[in-house]
A protein has these predicted regions:
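Catalytic cores and adjacent flexible loops of soluble metabolic enzymes
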Residues: 1-332
Length: 332
């Protein structure tokens, strides 16, 4: 099992190329597989009278700035993922060679844009399902069904209350799209980063089928950058990554073989706990072993029989004392 961890940088770069680069470096150092920014052009997302229009405008950066960020991600071997909100941002994402983009939940019913995504060169689409109805999600996925799809559960509540995460919905989504072999689940929590649930919730989501996790990262909570309410600082994010990597290890690689593909450690445990066939009393050579002559006990002998049924009616070649292990060399 492999869990992809996406450092959600969103709007935390605040339109500053230097800040964006610092976030990329922090994400790479913490062990994230990918970074994700919102590639915003105010005019393709909102009207000038919208309350956050000026904020969106402040996030705009030049094509050269985004090219430099892509090059930095390549240097640190970390994937660059972009939220795109229209033709302009999608065009730049394609120009940059971006393979994975995110469809923000704001566009779950934006049919025209979904059709453009379907025809684009991107390979994977992260579909944000926060606040979306099931039929809206189904319609969106059907339009982009030729792409690899990561269906993301979770929404931003600045921060999101624990009880509103509704992780049980992931099983409903999994069942609803079980016929789509190209759809996998992702989880994006936005809980208070200082609360233990900021690690336990995504860990639980992995157990519910999430193979991609999105977690907000900030340069420092005290800086109160955009989206800081649910963002971990670099040290916290590193702990989060380490926990998820340990979950990957614990998940293991069980198989359908008779021994489930046991590890060497478990095989040794099996040897240590197995009971072996030993005598209940002193037995003389030539005796035919019956049900009252032997029993299963733990013993230091690793050569003794473990299946008691196999020794019944066998004849002893030599005499055995009480609690003696019964081996293949003792019977005929």
């Amino acid at each position: 099992m492999k869990v992809e961890i996406v450092a959600e940088l969103a709007q935390g770069f605040e339109g500053c190329p230097k800040q964006a680069k610092l976030l990329v470096k922090a994400a790479a150092k913490a062990g994230a597989n990918a970074t994700k920014f919102q590639l915003i052009y105010a005019d393709e997302l909102a009207t000038p009278d919208y309350e956050y229009y000026e904020l969106f405008s402040s996030l705009e950066m030049s094509d050269d700035d985004w090219t430099n960020i892509k090059n930095l991600c390549d240097k640190y071997h970390i994937e660059l993922i972009l939220d795109v909100f229209g033709s302009t941002s999608l065009s730049l994402a394609e120009k940059l060679g971006i393979e994975t983009i995110k469809l923000h939940a704001t566009d779950i019913n934006n049919i025209g844009f979904l059709e453009k995504l379907a025809k684009s060169s991107v390979k994977r689409i992260m579909v944000g399902a926060g606040g979306a109805h099931l039929e809206e999600i189904k319609n969106a996925i059907e339009i982009v069904s030729m792409k690899q799809i990561i269906l993301f559960h979770g929404f931003q509540g600045y921060p999101t209350p624990i009880e509103d995460n509704q992780i049980s919905r992931m099983q409903l989504l999994k069942n609803a799209f079980s016929d789509y072999k190209n759809v996998v689940l992702g989880f994006s929590d936005h809980v208070d980063p200082t609360h233990p649930s900021s690690i336990t919730l995504p860990s639980y989501a992995v157990g519910q089928g999430a193979v991609v996790l999105e977690k907000h990262l900030t340069l420092g909570c005290c800086m109160e950058l955009e989206d800081h309410e649910a963002a971990m600082n670099p040290d916290q994010f590193k702990v989060f990554v380490d926990v998820i990597r340990n979950i990957e290890l614990a998940h293991g690689h069980s198989t359908l073989e008779n021994d489930f593909g046991m590890s060497a450690t478990e095989k040794q445990y099996r040897k240590n706990i197995r009971r072996h066939v030993v005598t209940l009393d002193n037995l003389q050579a030539g005796k035919s072993i019956g049900t009252g002559d032997v029993v299963l006990k733990r013993t230091s002998s690793v050569e003794a029989f473990t299946d008691i049924q196999t020794v019944y009616d066998k004849k002893l070649i030599s005499s055995l004392h009480e609690n003696a292990p019964v081996t293949k060399g003792d019977v005929e």
